[in-house]
Regions:
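NAD(P)+-binding Rossmann beta1-loop-alpha1 motif at the extreme N-terminus of oxidoreductases
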Residues: 1-53, 57
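Rossmann-like NAD(P)(H) cofactor-binding subdomain of soluble oxidoreductases
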Residues: 38, 46-49, 55-129
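A generic secondary-structure signal
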Residues: 18-21, 80, 178
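Internal alpha-helical scaffold of NAD(P)-dependent oxidoreductase catalytic cores
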Residues: 100-110, 125-159, 163-180
Length: 180
């Protein structure tokens, strides 16, 4: 399994860390260079991690694609990429619904929305998935507790509340450093 991440922010870092610490079998993980600091840090920390020259190289070389960019960036780049029907595409994009992702991807691939939270790096916490998907569930069950959502409207509640997790943990980290 070749895993490709388009976007390398805090959530990608947490997901990749969780994958590398799990029993998920993969041949390589290819990261976009979007955040050079994070992509280089992940490559240095774990084996089988590579940094792509561009996003299309990730799509060309991987059978699992993780879309981990902001909604604004997603609208600028996803429709330009040439995906394959055989790929599993997992979107972490908060406000882009499944219908819009399908339009942007332009092929009938296996597409899911997933809401990873920072504790995924420790293989803990809930991982909401929409729509229910056996292959995606079997992948993410190694990284936390999978919650299958049958109604996309309900996932908006998860997106809204989970958006506060990263700032909350950042605040705790800052406070902890200050106390030391």
């Amino acid at each position: 399994m070749k895993l490709g991440f388009i976007g390398t922010g805090k959530i990608t870092s947490a997901v990749v860390t969780g994958i590398c610490k799990s029993k998920i079998k993969y041949t390589k993980i290819i990261l976009s260079e979007r955040n050079k600091k994070i992509s280089k840090q992940l490559k240095k920390s774990f084996k089988k991690i590579y940094i792509a020259k561009n996003n299309q190289d990730i799509v060309n070389d991987c059978n699992w694609i993780f879309l981990a960019v902001t909604p604004t960036v997603a609208n600028q780049i996803i429709h330009k990429l040439k995906f394959k029907k055989s790929q599993v595409i997992v979107s972490f994009i908060s406000t882009m619904n499944l219908q819009n992702i399908k339009k942007a991807v332009k092929v009938k691939a296996n597409i899911s929305r997933v809401i990873p939270l920072p504790p995924i790096s420790f293989k803990k916490g809930p991982i909401p998935i929409f729509p229910p998907n056996r292959k995606v569930k079997n992948f993410f069950k190694h990284l936390g507790t999978v919650v299958e959502i049958k109604n996309e409207k309900l996932s908006k509640n998860f997106w809204s509340t989970s958006g506060m997790m990263a700032p909350f943990y950042e605040l705790l980290r800052t406070m902890s450093e200050w106390l030391n």
